[in-house]
């Protein structure tokens, strides 16, 4: 008998690194997308925390009137924000090395671009990492598809909208009250409440909340009893058990009688796909709506659409909304322009009949 011993070649450092990066045995899966996700999200988070606490005021409108957003400059958690980059910068890429000094970079709102661009790269990489881990485990890719909805929404308000409006100063501020201000100004300038894609998004969010509550309460109400009255019902479930933990037939019968028969799902897989798809499609549509309104394809305008026989306008709810929009538009960026565009878009009145002679 002859035994042949083959000498095993040493595994290179790169191969070991690749095996570690793509291993599903790690407590936290890294993956190739993780190589981009971790540094970008850490950078965005670190810069956001520092800027929210200590960033100096930013000349957001580009008119030498800085706006303070950080805690050390008088704000609190509610009013604080990372202020968007200056309108003087517009859509120019503005990294630190493009500024003459750190003070100039801070004054023009450089941290906003740094945070937003790293954040968008990070969440896109997180989405890719979800697909990558699903692929390694032999799972279907629907987790990654579902997460594409919030990624699309974030991209719409932080990147697509500034591109459409021509300036990062029109992006959403990174704070609570700044978000609300962005929403009010967006309504004033684009009438988003009258845009059908926004309506679909509202239906997606509120409908998703309703369906989630209905599903959770139905399942909790139809659990198969495995414990006594003196024990928590949660002890009746063992992680990884093969048996159903609730009676879907009972839940189906209850809901079918409560509403009507065909309002209730009799297929658990179809039910859970619906629970995932409804809010995801709604958020997709909202992101598409914001992205189109970024280029001023705005919501429906039904202003002064009802008149009497004499031609006098009979105000409808659309006219009430329009008046509110004009009020909000007048109030924002109060020193950047004298009138909102809607009020300044009438016929041009001549102010000089003859041009003055210019002596060269």
Swiss-Prot record:
EC number: 1.10.3.9
Binding-site list for a quinone: 215, 264-265
Keyword vocabulary terms for this entry: Calcium, Chlorophyll, Chloroplast, Chromophore, Electron transport, Herbicide resistance, Iron, Magnesium, Manganese, Membrane, Metal-binding, Oxidoreductase, Photosynthesis, Photosystem II, Plastid, Thylakoid, Transmembrane, Transmembrane helix, Transport
CDD domains reported for this sequence: Photosystem-II_D1
UniProt binding sites for [CaMn4O5] cluster: 170, 189, 332-333, 342, 344
Residues under site feature: Tyrosine radical intermediate: 161
Sites marked Stabilizes free radical intermediate: 190
Additional record remark: 2 of the reaction center chlorophylls (ChlD1 and ChlD2) are entirely coordinated by water. Herbicides such as atrazine, BNT, diuron or ioxynil bind in the Q(B) binding site and block subsequent electron transfer.
Cleavage (site feature) positions: 344-345
Gene3D superfamilies in the record: Photosystem II protein D1-like
Co-factor note (free text): The D1/D2 heterodimer binds P680, chlorophylls that are the primary electron donor of PSII, and subsequent electron acceptors. It shares a non-heme iron and each subunit binds pheophytin, quinone, additional chlorophylls, carotenoids and lipids. D1 provides most of the ligands for the Mn4-Ca-O5 cluster of the oxygen-evolving complex (OEC). There is also a Cl(-1) ion associated with D1 and D2, which is required for oxygen evolution. The PSII complex binds additional chlorophylls, carotenoids and specific lipids.
Family: Belongs to the reaction center PufL/M/PsbA/D family.
Membrane topology, record value: Multi-pass membrane protein
Uppermost EC category: oxidoreductase
InterPro entries in the record: D1/D2, Photo_II_D1/D2_sf, Photo_RC_L/M, Photo_RC_L/M_CS, PSII_D1
GO biological process terms on file: photosynthetic electron transport in photosystem II; response to herbicide
Protein name: Photosystem II protein D1
Gene Ontology molecular functions: chlorophyll binding; electron transporter, transferring electrons within the cyclic electron transport pathway of photosynthesis activity; iron ion binding; oxidoreductase activity, acting on diphenols and related substances as donors, oxygen as acceptor
